[in-house]
């Protein structure tokens, strides 16, 4: 069976001459890293460590219907693309989450990933949820071990939420988040920013099937460590 066709939609090409990741390092040095958080909120605080990665996430938020007739989060899955070089082209960097979300919404329902060939930026890893270390509930994971960091057993981070704030764009987009490391060596702090899409409908019929909702975001990760796969990356806004 032939693979399902992607929509006719063109991502802006990565800037020429800026390189692609090679084994053991990422594409671009970030220069001065800065994370710009929404004004008027106190739930998220600026990173205490150097920004090490900035990633474009393209995937799904997952939800289950409760007996109360409302949706509860059941985690998320996403591909993580290296957008380290886009800091050199602010017009693209500042809108890449919108460009990706437009393409992702146009993709047929049977297409579960846009893929690096469609996006045009290197795939670094995956975002998913795993059983929490306590054995109860689930925790978010950012994992490079199956893609850009094969053979690196600690090339992941399992995290816990520190805080969340409503996206500056409103309730149509999932919240911005700050998280902290629980396991792994990929990062000490993680931020979900520049979100597009992802929230569940307000109500559901108890007993109905789980749903998935498309979303995109930037993920900004910081670390004290000299990363095993990096030079440090760019600011997040």
Protein language model features and the residues they cover:
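Primary mode marks residue(s) on the alpha4-beta5-alpha5 output face of response regulator receiver
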Residues: 6-60, 69-237
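Universal eukaryotic N-terminal targeting presequences
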Residues: 1-5
């Amino acid at each position: 069976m032939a693979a399902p066709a992607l929509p006719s939609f063109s991502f802006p090409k990565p800037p020429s001459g800026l390189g692609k990741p090679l084994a053991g390092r990422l594409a671009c040095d970030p220069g001065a890293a800065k994370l710009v958080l929404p004004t008027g909120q106190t739930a998220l605080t600026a990173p205490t460590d150097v920004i090490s990665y900035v990633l474009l996430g393209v995937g799904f938020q997952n939800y289950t219907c409760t007996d109360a007739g409302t949706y509860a989060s059941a985690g998320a899955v996403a591909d993580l693309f290296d957008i380290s070089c886009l800091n050199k082209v602010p017009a693209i960097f500042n809108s890449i989450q919108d460009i990706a979300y437009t393409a992702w919404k146009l993709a047929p329902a049977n297409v579960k990933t846009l893929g690096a060939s469609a996006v045009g930026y290197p795939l670094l890893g995956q975002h998913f949820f795993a059983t929490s270390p306590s054995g109860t509930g689930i925790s978010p994971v950012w994992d490079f071990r199956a893609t850009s960091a094969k053979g690196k057993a600690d090339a992941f981070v399992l995290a816990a939420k520190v805080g969340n704030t409503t996206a500056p764009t409103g309730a149509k987009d999932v919240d911005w988040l700050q998280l902290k490391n629980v396991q792994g060596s990929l990062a000490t702090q993680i931020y979900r920013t520049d979100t597009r899409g992802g929230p569940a409908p307000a109500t559901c019929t108890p007993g109905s099937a789980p749903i998935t909702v498309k979303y995109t975001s930037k993920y900004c990760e910081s670390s004290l460590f000299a990363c095993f796969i990096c030079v440090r990356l760019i600011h997040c806004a």
